[in-house]
Amino acid sequence: MQKGEAVGAGETLVGHEGPVWQVAWAHPSFGTILASASYDGKVFIWKNESTNGSYGSGGWARIKDHALHTASVNAIAWAPHELGATLACASSDGRVSVLTFNEDGSWSVDLVAAHPGGCHAVSWMPVSTATTEPGAPMMCRLATAGCDAVVKIWEFSEEHNRYVEIDQLKQHRDWVRDVAFAPSLGLARTYLATASQDRTVLIWTQDTPNDPWKCTPLLPGAKPEDRTKFADTVWRVSWSVSGNVLAVSCGDGKVSLWKENLKGDWECISEYVCPVN
């Protein structure tokens, strides 16, 4: 196979009535399952049921239509597979819905009124970073971000049988565009990155699940009065698989990579300028 050559014919999954903002694969232990989120306010869950495993064989079926939102669904994220087949959906209607596939084949839905004015992003905390001691029950936590400039942390409460807000992170001054928990491989604490319309990226750390969050801004600016400011809106943040390098995507067409040094400071180790056609 030559570089860039298609593996198969491919297949177009049709059904949404507006732009599709995001797609997300479920963990392979649940099968070949793909979720899609759209401006039409719907989330579709698709499953490839072909016997030979080919993605382009016409074996895709839409197994769930999630249409409870009244505005665009902007982001989706599957929970850690240890928590089951669970999908969080963030919408411009201000709500976050959590879809869970049950053992009897049914789907259950939890709705959370998260952010007045709209929710832009959602991210699940890795399971291993939320366990305080061996044998302790797995904590089910996620972070959401939206138009209120606030990042909220939620936890599923067995006592109340619903998701409850346990923390608010309030350092941003404008819409929070993205939020991302770092993978927990080899990390001593929990890391959470947030990106905002205010042109800043903040790194939040928590030593244990009950400790307060500590905030450290990235420092991309050359001028002392603008040290925390990127050149434009920061749209996305994404962690490396090992969780020690953060990619930052900015509105000026640049992607920068950041890494924490031994002193606990974050340094830009690389920068890529996207070509303009």
Locations of the language-model features?
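WD40-repeat beta-propellers
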Residues: M1-Q2, V23, V43-N48, I76, ...
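Beta-propeller domains
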Residues: M1-T12, S50-T51
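WD40/WD-repeat beta-propeller blade-loop signature
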Residues: A9, P19, F30-I33, R62, ...
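WD40/WD-repeat beta-propeller blade N-cap
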Residues: L13-V20, H66-V73, V112-C119, M125-P126, ...
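Loop/turn segments within WD40 beta-propeller blades
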Residues: A24-G31, A77-G84, S123-M139, A180-R189, ...
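Conserved strand-to-loop turn within each blade of WD40 beta-propeller repeats
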Residues: S36-D40, N48, C89-D93, F101, ...
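Solenoidal tandem-repeat scaffolds enriched in leucines and small polar residues
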Residues: G56-S157
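Terminal intrinsically disordered, low-complexity extensions flanking WD-repeat/beta-propeller proteins
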Residues: A130, R177, P183, L187-T190, ...
